[in-house]
């Protein structure tokens, strides 16, 4: 019997409650054994803010998931030089864990970008994409995507960074404390 592992990639700059809820909902609704959080170094589709270092983002992720045994962090993309593509990461993971079915979790806002992903036609054969339904993002794409529902959470890392003084409610308590202690995102 194959293992079922979810993967949630992102910049996690900072990791927030919506990331946590997405992972929890995907795990529960799809019966996944564990969730791997996959922090990106240089996502090809985004400009990096550079606000928190790789180490700080990983530390915040660790704080967010430390009480959840079935949640782990995979830092392989942070170790790569240059751009890091999901295709390369998944090729490596499948080679390392051939007895595992991978479920790549994306927010509803990312579904419309799938056709632009590097080697997407190969990637959709390697993983099952899981789209988290969000009312504002109902874009259809020519790929099979498992959809899961979760309550609307209007949270984004960009908004949190831009208004850090009012972001406490959107962050796990330990992540908020870390941001204050390390004076990230202008928080003094």
Swiss-Prot record:
Coiled-coil portions: none
Q: Which UniProt keywords apply?
A: ATP-binding, NAD, Nucleotide-binding, Nucleotidyltransferase, Pyridine nucleotide biosynthesis, Transferase
Q: In which pathway does it act?
A: Cofactor biosynthesis; NAD(+) biosynthesis; deamido-NAD(+) from nicotinate D-ribonucleotide: step 1/1
* Catalytic activity as recorded in UniProt: nicotinate beta-D-ribonucleotide + ATP + H(+) = deamido-NAD(+) + diphosphate
Please name the Pfam families in this protein's record.
CTP_transf_like
Recorded GO MF terms: ATP binding; nicotinate-nucleotide adenylyltransferase activity
SUPFAM superfamilies xref list: Nucleotidylyl transferase (SSF52374)
Q: Say if the entry is tagged with keyword Nucleotidyltransferase.
A: yes
List the EC numbers from the record: 2.7.7.18
- A Gene Ontology biological process annotation? NAD biosynthetic process
Q: What does this protein do?
A: Catalyzes the reversible adenylation of nicotinate mononucleotide (NaMN) to nicotinic acid adenine dinucleotide (NaAD).
Similarity comment: Belongs to the NadD family.
Q: Which HAMAP family match?
A: NaMN_adenylyltr
Q: What is this protein called?
A: Probable nicotinate-nucleotide adenylyltransferase
Q: Which organism does this sequence originate in?
A: Listeria innocua serovar 6a (strain ATCC BAA-680 / CLIP 11262)
Q: Which gene encodes it?
A: nadD
């Amino acid at each position: 019997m194959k293992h079922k592992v979810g993967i949630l990639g992102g910049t996690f700059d900072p990791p927030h409650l919506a990331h946590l809820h997405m992972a929890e909902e995907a795990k529960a609704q799809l019966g996944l054994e564990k969730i791997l959080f996959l922090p990106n170094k240089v996502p090809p589709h985004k400009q990096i803010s550079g606000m928190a270092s790789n180490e700080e983002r990983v530390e915040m992720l660790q704080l967010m998931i430390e009480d959840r045994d079935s949640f782990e962090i995979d830092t392989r993309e942070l170790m790569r030089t240059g751009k890091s593509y999901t295709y390369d990461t998944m090729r490596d993971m499948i080679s390392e864990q051939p007895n595992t079915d991978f479920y790549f979790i994306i927010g509803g806002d990312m579904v419309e970008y799938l056709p632009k992903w590097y080697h997407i036609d190969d990637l959709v054969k390697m993983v099952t994409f899981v789209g988290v339904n969000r009312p504002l993002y109902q874009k259809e794409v020519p790929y099979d995507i498992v959809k899961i529902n979760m309550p609307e959470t209007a949270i984004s890392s960009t908004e949190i960074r831009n208004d850090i003084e009012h972001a406490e409610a959107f962050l796990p308590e330990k992540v908020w404390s870390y941001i204050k202690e390390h004076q990230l995102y202008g928080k003094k």
